[in-house]
């Protein structure tokens, strides 16, 4: 379908009117050629995004098919063809004046429709840019979900490591308790050995006292034996002297008897008798003294032997106790060293565990803060998207109003000249395809994705 020269007029004047209409539309609607395109949808800071959003608040998400433009052009052709038919059939100057007025109105509507088409083209371009931005946001949300899964995996690994460290700590604590029990048992044995040592030392002191007493008794007995031996020697020497004196006297008396022959025979026999009696008495005293001394010496020797046996056994017991005490002391020192080593290991493990736990908590807190910031950013984008949808709905209402106005003009012209002209063509309603997605659905999908990431 084409325009006639009568309806379109001069091409230069038509182009001038379209240009003026576009410039006036740019001044009225925010200059789509300059105002809209001068602002860019940036991914900067929240202040930059909000400012750019305020400047480009008229850029909603719209998807229109090319059928709408073809339908609009067909409706324009229909209006102009109706005006041509109207101008050719009506007689009179009033009708020409009304036709010129209607022609001017149609030209104004045509100019407005041209500006509207340009605005639609611009909105389609902005719609593509916004769709690309939404796709980028969805990819970012998917990357955040994957990052959340990675964080969850790392948190699970950290929790498993923490459980392993707690298990090792419990095992070390159990070993420490066992060592404490062993140390307590060794302390009890050490105290018992110390008591036995004290008892043994007390017995040794008592035996030493007995030994000292026995030594004193032995010294006294030795002194008595020595005195008795001296006395025996003195008595023996005295007896020998007396015997010698008596023998000398006997010899002297024997000589005298020899001289006197038979006068002194009785004296020699008496002396012999006296000598025999003295020797018998001396032998008896010597035998009794030796027997008493031997008995006493045997008793003292037996007592000393018994004391020596007791002392030797006591010394052996003391040496055995000393060896046991030394071995227990060495064992106690080794156990103390093991305890100190385990305590140091336990303190190191606790310190490392506390450090790892604090680092894990810091990491978890950092991840939670990042997740919270991501959710806030997503909520901010959803709010911006809601505002864009609101602007889009307002523009849809305005577009519907323009369409109703154009359809009303077409209907009025069609009803005016339906009887005279007849139907020239079948009018098709413009097809408009609007792809939109409600914010509630996006919020619901975001909640589902958050629940999946939390699980």
From Swiss-Prot:
UniProt region (Linker 2), positions on chain: 289-292
Biased composition annotated in UniProt, kind: Polar residues: 1-13
Keywords: Acetylation, Cell projection, Coiled coil, Cytoplasm, Cytoskeleton, Glycoprotein, Intermediate filament, Methylation, Phosphoprotein
Annotated localization: Cytoplasm, Cytoskeleton; Cell projection, Axon
Gene Ontology biological process: neurofilament bundle assembly
Region named Tail: 414-455
Gene3D superfamilies: 1.20.5.170, Single helix bin, Vasodilator-stimulated phosphoprotein
Residues annotated with N-acetylserine modification: 2
GO cellular component: a single term: cytoplasm
Region (Linker 1): 138-150
UniProt-annotated glycosylation sites, renumbered to this chain: 48, 433
Residue span, IF rod domain: 102-413
Listed Low complexity bias regions: 22-45
Region annotated Linker 12, chain positions: 250-266
Modified-residue entries (Omega-N-methylarginine), positions: 43
Modified residues (Phosphoserine): 31, 100, 227, 347, 420, 431, 453
Residue span of region Coil 1B: 151-249
Region feature (Coil 2B): 293-412
Protein family: Belongs to the intermediate filament family.
Role, per record: Neurofilaments usually contain three intermediate filament proteins: NEFL, NEFM, and NEFH which are involved in the maintenance of neuronal caliber. May additionally cooperate with the neuronal intermediate filament proteins PRPH and INA to form neuronal filamentous networks.
Protein name: Neurofilament medium polypeptide
Originating organism: Sus scrofa
């Amino acid at each position: 379908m084409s325009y006639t020269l009568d309806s379109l007029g001069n091409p230069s004047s038509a182009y001038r009117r379209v240009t003026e209409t576009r410039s006036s539309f740019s001044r009225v609607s925010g200059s789509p050629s300059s105002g809209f395109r001068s602002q860019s949808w940036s991914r900067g800071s929240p202040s930059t995004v909000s400012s750019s959003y305020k400047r480009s608040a008229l850029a909603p998400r719209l998807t229109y098919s090319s059928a709408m433009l073809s339908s609009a052009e067909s409706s324009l052709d229909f209006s102009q063809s109706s005006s041509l038919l109207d101008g050719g059939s009506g007689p009179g100057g009033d009708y020409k004046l009304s036709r010129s007025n209607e022609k001017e109105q149609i030209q104004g509507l045509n100019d407005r429709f041209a500006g509207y088409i340009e605005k639609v083209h611009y909105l389609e371009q902005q719609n593509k840019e916004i769709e690309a931005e939404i796709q980028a946001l969805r990819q970012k949300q998917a990357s955040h979900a994957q990052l959340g899964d990675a964080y969850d995996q790392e948190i699970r690994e950290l929790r498993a490591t923490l459980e392993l460290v707690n298990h090792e700590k419990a095992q070390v604590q159990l070993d420490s308790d066992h060592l404490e029990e062993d140390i307590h048992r060794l302390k009890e044995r050490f105290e018992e050995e110390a008591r036995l040592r004290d008892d043994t030392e007390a017995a040794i002191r008592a035996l030493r006292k007995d030994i000292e007493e026995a030594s004193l008794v032995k010294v006294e007995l030795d002194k008595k034996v020595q005195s008795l031996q001296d006395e025996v020697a003195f008595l023996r020497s005295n007896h020998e002297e007396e015997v010698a004196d008596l023998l000398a006297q006997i010899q002297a008396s024997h000589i005298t008897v020899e001289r006197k022959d038979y006068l002194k025979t009785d004296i020699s026999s008496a002396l012999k008798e006296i000598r025999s009696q003295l020797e018998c008495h001396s032998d008896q005293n010597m035998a009794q003294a030796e027997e008493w001394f031997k008995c006493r010496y045997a008793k003292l020797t037996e007592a000393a032997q018994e004391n020596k046996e007791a002392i030797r056994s006591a010394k052996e017991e003391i040496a055995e106790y000393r060896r046991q005490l030394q071995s227990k002391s060495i064992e106690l020192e080794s156990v103390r060293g093991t305890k100190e080593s385990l305590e140091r290991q336990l303190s190191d493990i606790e310190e490392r565990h506390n450090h790892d736990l604090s680092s894990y908590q810091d990491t978890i807190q950092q991840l939670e803060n990042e997740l919270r910031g991501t959710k806030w950013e997503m909520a901010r984008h959803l709010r911006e998207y809601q505002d864009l949808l609101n602007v889009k709905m307002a523009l849809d209402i305005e577009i519907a109003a323009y369409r109703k106005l154009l359809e009303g003009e077409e209907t009025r012209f069609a009803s005016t000249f339906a009887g005279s002209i007849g139907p020239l063509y079948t009018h098709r309603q413009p097809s408009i395809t609007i792809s939109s997605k409600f914010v509630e659905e996006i919020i619901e999908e975001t909640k589902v994705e958050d629940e999946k990431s939390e699980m």
